[in-house]
Regions:
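Bacterial Sec-dependent N-terminal signal peptides
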Residues: 1-11, 28-84
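Cationic, low-complexity basic patches in intrinsically disordered or flexible, solvent-exposed regions
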Residues: 20
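Phosphate-group recognition and catalysis centered on beta-loop-alpha active-site segments
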Residues: 75-83, 149-426
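Compositionally biased, intrinsically disordered low-complexity regions
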Residues: 8, 27, 42, 52, ...
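Extracellular/lumenal mature domains of secreted and surface-exposed proteins
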Residues: 75-178
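Conserved NAD(P)+-binding/catalytic subdomain of aldehyde/semialdehyde dehydrogenases
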Residues: 14
């Protein structure tokens, strides 16, 4: 990346996740060229007394040519800057999330020392990442020494337990807590548009652990959050998301659940995730629908949110696809589609449904295979489950059918949570 200071460029390579160590020879060469350019520009535009103004600025042009060569080379596939040592580390993480610190493009035997900023110092070799899990939230500065290189990097630790750690509670024999997942970020407040940025705040305020949402992709490749593939039901416009550009989507406003038009726009997946980052978990339903798995995973990785997100997969094939991108993904499937997770380290949810078409999903083999049960308590054809009121009789029946339930998905988290508390399940 080039940053221009006045007319004279200097080169830095800095990204959110990687910090480039500048090559030792380049700054001196750039400084020399900059001085020469300043002198030549001065002579060219302000000629000395007695000097002809038509003098050709040969050395000035040479300086520009040299600089252009450096910049062009820096942008090529054989960029020497890319081959210099650089630090790779996340800038955000959750409590007890494993943070990896790695120096790339350096001799593997180089000694590495990492001061994590909380009193913890670890040493190792460049060949292997140095890992650490923070136990307290806050902003920290990492000080990393690798041979002759020294780099500092800021990292924010959110006050939310990483999913890998949080899911362990469901294996504890005395665990009594049932999590609540809010369907489309719904609560009993119908004035908040579903799957909107404001609905994220509403869901967090309700006390739910997880927000469920759906993803689609526009014709120009922007992943957005919406349940339907069309915008007909949720906005004051009409059209198929996959056939509209993101700019076209932004012409329309979201409607609340009473049908009134609001000031809110359909959010991108990135905006939706950022709105609750570090405060609540997300379940990306069908992971994805019209977006590709790679598109969705890339966004989650970019935001350093792999320990905050479930990838719901409606088939074993989709689960394999997501796990093929990253085996660290918290995949989450319909019951019977869980085979790709068997034998993997970690704990995984599978989903059942209460009273869909008048019936509840049989448990099948998922529980015997070590999966954790989540149950939908949602309106469906053939059932009287309401989106607007909580039927506690239905809740009691659900708990009887699925006594091992770990999480319930609902449109009414603010009503379900007190009902679970009254039953000793929070």
């Amino acid at each position: 990346m080039l940053f221009f200071i006045g007319a004279f460029p200097s080169i830095f390579v800095i990204t959110e996740r990687n910090e480039q160590v500048p090559p030792s020879g380049v700054p001196f060469l750039l400084t020399f060229i900059e001085i020469q350019m300043k002198n030549e520009l001065l002579h060219f535009f302000v000629p000395e007394k007695g000097r002809r103004t038509k003098r050709q600025p040969i050395s000035w042009l040479c300086c520009w040519a040299i600089l252009l060569g450096i910049v062009c080379n820096a942008c090529s596939d054989d960029d020497p800057v890319k081959k210099n040592p650089y630090l790779q580390v996340s800038t955000r993480a959750l409590l007890k999330e494993v943070v990896e610190v790695k120096f790339n493009n350096i001799d593997g035997n180089t000694d590495i020392t990492v001061d994590f900023g909380d009193g913890t110092v670890k040493e190792g070799k460049a060949a292997n990442p140095i890992t650490y899990a923070y136990t307290q939230s806050g902003d920290y500065t990492l000080h990393v020494t690798a041979g002759q290189y020294e780099v500092q990097k800021r990292i924010r630790i959110y006050n939310l337990l990483a999913l890998t750690e949080a899911m362990k509670q469901f294996r504890e024999p005395d665990n009594k807590k049932v999590w609540v997942m809010t369907h489309r970020a719904h609560t009993s407040d119908r004035t908040v548009p579903e799957n909107s940025v404001s609905s994220v705040e509403d869901a967090i305020d309700s006390g739910a652990e997880v927000i469920e949402c759906d993803t689609h992709v526009t014709s120009d490749g922007v992943v957005v959050v919406c349940h339907d593939q069309t915008i007909n039901a949720t906005t004051n416009g009409t059209g198929d998301i996959t056939k509209m550009t993101y700019a076209e989507l932004q012409k329309y406003n979201l409607k609340d659940r009473n049908g009134r038009v609001t000031d809110e726009k359909m959010p991108t997946l990135e905006e939706f995730l950022k709105a609750g980052r570090g405060r609540i978990y997300y379940n990306l339903d069908y992971s994805p629908r019209t977006a590709t798995s790679q598109q969705v995973v890339d966004i989650v990785m970019k935001l350093d949110m792999m320990e905050s997100v479930f990838f719901y997969c409606n088939s074993a094939q989709k689960a394999e696809e997501v796990l093929g991108i990253t085996p660290k993904a918290h995949v989450y499937t319909w019951t019977g589609s869980h085979k790709p997770m068997m034998g993997l380290p970690g704990n995984y949810f599978v989903q059942y449904s209460y009273l869909t078409n008048g019936k509840s999903t049989p448990l099948g083999s998922s529980i015997n295979d070590g999966m954790l049960a989540t149950v939908n308590m949602l309106p469906a054809s053939g059932s009287n489950v309401s989106e607007w009121t909580l039927n506690e009789g239905y809740l009691d029946e659900l708990l009887q059918i699925y006594p091992m339930v770990c999480m319930i998905q609902t449109d009414l988290p603010d009503l379900l949570i007190p009902a679970l508390q009254a039953r000793g399940l929070r």
